[in-house]
């Protein structure tokens, strides 16, 4: 089993990688760049864990973002561990909404729950899991709590569902679905979105003309496709926050 560990910078991702793999690690470089590539073997199993560079989105604007995109498109990934900073949950969930589009099973490691509690942030893990349709495990890399629960979930009850929620309105979602059906490759939904966004890196590589669809979406929403996608992701995140997050009075 191949596991991709993905999250924002400073989310505790590398600390979690160390806790999951111990001394069973190899360090190299990603092709073409000097960024470290860390891989390890998950404790009590033979699953491979890859510590991907910290990113905030899957736009093609940095080496780190391109590495993560390319990895998810080119490698056979069985599971994503998406580590989230509990003290910045809305910012963290933006990347989560983009990871949905790869249709890869996912588990969320909700880190820094102890710090969030100290700051008066209350996160209902069950409500968060239900709102996202993703298993959520609260952890603290600093205090090393929840790590055994996370490993147990991965090894004994490995998530396999990719039945993620539809978060975009129509006609945007309908256009994404229609475009995805025309693509004879994996990660269809992610690539369909990138085509409709006219992604500077991926769109030129895909032989499919979606210019008419882009114009229809622009005319309907009175905004560019990228702006519409971002707005609807943020709207979804706000709904999730209202369901699962509260502040101590």
PLM regions and their residue ranges:
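Alpha-helical transmembrane helix bundles of large polytopic membrane transport and channel proteins
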Residues: 107, 117-248
């Amino acid at each position: 089993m191949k596991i991709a560990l993905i999250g924002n910078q400073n989310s505790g991702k590398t600390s979690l990688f160390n806790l999951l793999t111990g001394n069973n690690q190899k360090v190299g470089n990603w092709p073409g760049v000097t960024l470290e590539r860390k891989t390890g073997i998950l404790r009590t199993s033979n699953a491979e864990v890859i510590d991907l560079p910290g990113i905030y989105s899957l736009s093609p604007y940095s080496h780190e973002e391109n590495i993560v995109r390319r990895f998810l498109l080119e490698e056979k990934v069985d599971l994503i561990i998406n580590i989230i900073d509990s003290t910045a949950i809305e910012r963290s969930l933006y990347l989560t909404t983009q990871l949905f589009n790869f249709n890869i099973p996912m588990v969320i490691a909700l880190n820094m729950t102890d710090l969030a509690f100290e700051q008066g942030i209350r996160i209902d893990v069950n409500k968060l899991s239900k709102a996202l349709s993703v298993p959520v495990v609260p952890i603290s890399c600093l205090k090393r709590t929840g790590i055994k629960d996370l490993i147990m979930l991965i090894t004994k009850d490995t998530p396999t569902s990719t039945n993620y929620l539809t978060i975009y309105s129509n006609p945007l979602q309908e256009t994404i679905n229609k475009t995805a059906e025309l693509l004879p490759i994996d990660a269809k939904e992610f690539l369909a979105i990138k085509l409709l966004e006219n992604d500077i890196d991926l769109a030129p590589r895909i032989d499919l003309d979606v210019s008419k669809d882009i114009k229809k979406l622009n005319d309907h929403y009175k905004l560019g496709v990228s702006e519409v996608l971002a707005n609807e992701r943020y709207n979804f995140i706000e709904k999730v926050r209202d369901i699962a997050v509260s502040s101590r009075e």
